[in-house]
Amino acid sequence: MLALVPLYAGAANDDENDSSEQFDWNPVMEAIILVESEGNPRIVNGNQVGAMQITPIMVRECNNILKARGSEKQYKMTDRYDVEKSKEMFLLIQSQYNKSNNVEKAIRSWNGGPNYSNRGTERYYQKVLRRMK
């Protein structure tokens, strides 16, 4: 239900770096997991693996973000099979590219990449919305 998570949610304060940490992405992540893998963390579909169907490009992008932020943390390709680490990667991507915590943008870009089209991601977007609690 959209009543639990608005489609556009601003940060609780003006600090953009903290906005995704303050916003509750759990309903979105859980719905994406159900759509992507029915919750199976071992699923493989081409180069997309794990509960959130993360690609090697996504892992590299997360590592680039971490490096740019001065972090020594780095994700491994096997981390895609770990649901909690997959969620961390999702949150990291949101904190970098979706600072306004726009749920629609998060869902569509998870499916279609940063240059998604509404038309190309509409089916996926609707499936995720139906799975949100």
Predicted features and spans:
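Catalytic glycan-binding domains that act on GlcNAc-containing polysaccharides
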Residues: 12-133
